[in-house]
Amino acid sequence: MRNKLHADKHPEDWELKRLLGGINLRSTWGKRTYLMIVFICHTGLRIGELTRLTVADVVWGEEPREEVFLSHRITKGQKSRVVPFNDIAKQCVRKLLEFNRKRGFSIGPEAPLFPWKTHGFLPSREAEREIQKLREKVGLSPKITPHSFRHYFANRMKNAGVDPFTMAVILGHASVDTTQMYTNTSSANKRAAVNRLAGKGVA
């Protein structure tokens, strides 16, 4: 049962599209909320890790880093890890810096990547509330949470053929078993697997 509960948590593509489509990008925090969701979907960071990132964590010089080093001080289980950035994650960083600069927030090395209205770090609970309100606005299941975007990231890695050990390292799991609970096989993938057997073997 535990595997079932974990496996069912990741959102489908259509759910993410509806969620992102429900954001008012002209509202005070709309664009940041949009970028936050996309960033998690492409890095798999926990919300507590995301909200404690500084500009220096993700930027070298004037460009996004190739990867982010997550210190043991902010990770679950106090184990440091490195998470690579793909092109979409890098673009999120650029847009976040632009967002912060235009709204008068510092973009200095020690400044929060996700600042709050007090110019401090965005509280994790506030980020969760933002997603909850958005989810309710567009009529999606309560399973859509910041953590579910991490599950979405894990499933995309699995579907791309990433091996379980590498996935566990990127996600910061102590055990591959934990990573496997984050992933499940979609109906489409199961159909494709069975269809590959057609024309082979007995008929």
Annotate each language-model stretch with its function:
Residues 1-10, 198-203:
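C-terminal secondary-structure termini that scaffold catalytic or DNA-interacting sites
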Residues 5-6, 75-94, 109-132:
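C-terminal catalytic core of Y-nucleophile DNA break-rejoin enzymes
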Residues 38, 42, 150-173:
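C-terminal catalytic core of tyrosine-transesterase DNA break-rejoin enzymes
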Residues 58-62, 141, 163-183:
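Short, polar N-cap/turn motifs at the start of nucleic acid-interacting alpha helices
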Residues 74, 171-196:
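Catalytic-site neighborhood detector that most strongly recognizes the C-terminal catalytic loop/helix
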